Amino acid sequence: MASEKQIVLVTPVWNDSIRLGRFGPELAQALASSGLSVRWIVSDDGSSALEKAALGTLVDRLRGVYPQIELQLNQERVRKGGAIYRAWDMCTEADILAFVDADGAIDAASVLRLLSHACAQDPMSGVIGVRHNTVATPVQRPWQRAVSFRVFTILVRRLIGVDFEDTQCGIKVVPAAAYHVMAANLMERGFVFDVELLLALQQQGCQITELRIPWREIPEGKVRPLLDAWGMIAGLLRIRQRAKAGQY
């Protein structure tokens, strides 16, 4: 039975057509056979002209499998959070808003699982993926990434008070009504936008379910743990200041 809830799924992309080219067909096929009402938006984050052209060709090809896909091009770089929020902002008819990374680290089956879970929940509930290494949900990543992940999680809990197992996993599903109420107060667009989003959702009274999913490191990722660490910490401090000021 098809879901009655209208879902918007955004895949942010920045100079990443090759990895989306590997993951996109899998996700398109999964969405086509899901029975869910999903508007899939590939949101480009100011990629090069060649990348934009490659994305256009790719989306045209994927449309043959899943017609409800579209490409949104941003002329300037707006960062990952900006690419997601710009797409969400134009979808006022949606009941559920979601995003999934373009690299394929999260498989299509997990995407459908989270979307289906959200459809069955209370309208003011959300769902996020969690990377937790078990037999059922194997996680494959270098030890350096595992260490930086644990350190960042501790910082988030101590600085922000957001007590989730994994704030940075590349799939989140949120209630559209709650997002549109708080959207103007969301300032972060870089790698810590997820933390601010989750904090604001909690402040809105939303219940967030954490679902463990399989995950594997895909080469050519955009996050550089050592180089990006200071910027991410600065972002957490900005979020903390806004939270103390009652912005959320």
Predicted regions and their residues:
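Hydrophobic helical membrane-anchoring modules
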Residues: 1-7, 185-248
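Hydrophobic targeting segments
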Residues: 5-11, 27, 38-43, 233
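A conserved acidic beta->alpha catalytic loop
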Residues: 44-55, 104
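Acceptor/aglycone-binding surface of glycosyltransferases and processive sugar-polymer synthases
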Residues: 75-91, 96, 108-187, 218-223
